[in-house]
Structures are given as C-alpha cells and as structure tokens.
Curated annotation (Swiss-Prot):
Pfam families: Neugrin (PF06413). Required for respiratory activity and maintenance and expression of the mitochondrial genome. It is found in: Mitochondrion. Signal peptide: none annotated. This is Required for respiratory growth protein 9, mitochondrial. Residues 101-114, 124-135 have a biased composition (Low complexity). Residues 138-148 have a biased composition (Basic and acidic residues). Residues 63-88 have a biased composition (Polar residues). Residues 63-166 are annotated as: Disordered. It comes from Aspergillus fumigatus (strain ATCC MYA-4609 / CBS 101355 / FGSC A1100 / Af293) (Neosartorya fumigata). It comes from the Eukaryota. Residues 1-45 form a transit peptide. Keywords: Mitochondrion, Transit peptide. Belongs to the RRG9 family.
Length: 280
C-alpha cells in the first residue's frame, strides 16, 4: 500500500510555524493604541476568524498574520475561544462586538457608548410622541365626561318627582318674598281696620290697594281677609299689653337716636339704665 500524504501537513514547516508564533507575540505586546477600533480592522479580523473556524485550515493563518490586528487578546487565545464557542453564538471583544452568523456578510460591530446614544435618541421622540397622545386622550375624555355628567344630572332632576311639601314650599316662596318673619308686622288694630275697610267697600278697597296702603304682600292681605279666627277677650288683653311694650321699646330706641322726645313709659326700656344702674 502506498502511504497517503496529507497536503495540509506538507505545507506546514518549522520556519513557517516559528514566524507565525513570533508575529503573534509581537502584536500582543504592542496592544491597541486607540480605545476604539476601526470598522475596517474589525471586518478583516472577522474574515480571519471565519477562516480560522474551519477544521485543519492552517494555511489561513498566513493571511491573518499579514493583517495588523488591534485586538487586546492574542490570536492564539482568540483561536482557542473560537474553537470552544458555537458557530451561532456571538463573541465579545474589548471595545466592540462581533456576531458570527451563517451568512458571511452579517458582521455587526458597535461600541457601548454609540449604542446608548442611539437608544436615547430613538427613545426620546417615542416618549414625546407617546406622551402627547395620552394627554390628548385624557383631555378628550374629560371634555366628553363633563357634558355627560351635566346632562345626566339634569335628567335625574327632571325625572325625580317632587314631594308635596316641596311644591308647597316653592309656592310659598313665590308668594312671601320676605319670608315667614317679615320686618313689617301689622298690629291687631291694623288687622281689624283691614277687615272693616274690605267689608264696607270691597270694590274700592281691593287686595292690591290694601297691600299697597299697608305695605305688605297681597298674599298676606288675602289670608287676613280669609281667616275666620277671632281671639277671646283674655287673648285680646294679652295682645294689647304685648303691643304696648313693643311700642315703648321702639320709642326708647328712637329716643336714644335723637328721633323722639323722652317719655316716662319708655325709660324702663332704655339702655342707659342698664349701663349706669348696676350694683357696684
């Protein structure tokens, strides 16, 4: 049998191996001069990496050695890492990133600072664009909810049936604008005079005329004429005394203001007596 000679083994020689080892150590000692790699050097290094990746392709080392590399790791160590890593996994270097794929043209190289800057630039317009529609949607919702609430409140008020006492209260407010305790109060003599005038000449002393004359509401005159209640003699006497005290109190107040002359019956209601007749 004729011995078969390997072509790749025949190409290997001692001078070639020594030259490759010396060049790899020299490039490792030099190290990278700049922190950032150039795209051209990274591309050529990736091509050399793909050629080294194949089994028994030692001839490609000569082509890789002719190219000056800027990697921080020595080629021998890179070759060991490449042999251990799988073909589909990416390999990381000091300043960049090389992703190996099945397609030879897919070589991605980028720096962390450049990637972060690109991400910030891309996220800034997206954030502003996302915030504006959200604000517009919230304002539109508020505007749409406001008329809904107002219309619902109006409908609920209109649909809700009022109680009898509420209807009566509204009617009394329209009739008695001054309320149940008006400042103008009619004395018992005035009440009897209103009844007497209306009984003598009802066509002449009508309700509006009497209301204008006594300065009260027409509803008050109507109720006075309509009421059939009459006080007893005892109640009339109590009422007369009460109205006399009221008259003297008002007279004393007007005397203090200088509008009326002093009166003996009104002296007991004066504030002067309350202030100066206190026991020491």
């Amino acid at each position: 049998m004729s011995s078969s000679i390997c072509v790749a083994s025949s190409r290997l020689s001692l001078p070639t191996l020594l030259r490759n080892v010396c060049r790899s150590e020299f490039t490792a000692d030099l190290g990278p001069r700049s922190e950032y790699k150039s795209f051209f050097a990274m591309q050529r290094a990736a091509l050399a990496y793909r050629r080294i990746r194949g089994p028994r392709q030692f001839s490609s080392l000569t082509l890789a050695d002719d190219i000056p590399t800027t990697s921080k790791q020595p080629p021998s160590r890179a070759a060991n890492v490449s042999s251990v890593s799988q073909p589909g996994e990416p390999t990381k270097t000091g300043a960049g990133e090389i992703r190996a794929s099945s397609h030879p043209s897919e070589v991605v190289s980028s720096s962390p600072r450049a990637d972060s800057a690109k991400r910030k630039k891309a996220s800034a317009p997206e954030a502003t664009a996302g915030a504006k529609p959200a604000a517009n949607e919230s304002s539109d919702k508020k505007r749409s909810e406001a008329p809904r609430k107002s219309s619902l409140s109006i409908l609920s008020k209109s649909k809700k049936k009022k109680e009898p006492w509420q209807i009566q209260k509204e009617a009394l407010k329209k009739k008695f604008k001054e309320g149940w305790n008006p400042p103008k109060k009619l004395s018992p003599d005035a009440l009897e005079g209103i009844r007497h005038l209306h009984a003598v000449a009802p066509d002449r002393f009508t309700t509006p005329v009497l209301a204008e004359q006594f300065q009260v509401s027409p509803e008050a005159i109507r109720r006075i004429l309509k009421s059939k209640w009459r006080p007893s003699p005892e109640e009339m006497e109590k009422r007369r005394e009460r109205w006399e005290r009221r008259h003297d109190r008002i007279w004393s107040q007007m005397t203090e203001l200088g509008l009326r002359r002093p009166k003996r019956s009104a002296e007991k209601f004066s504030d002067v007596k309350v202030l100066y007749d206190k026991p020491v």
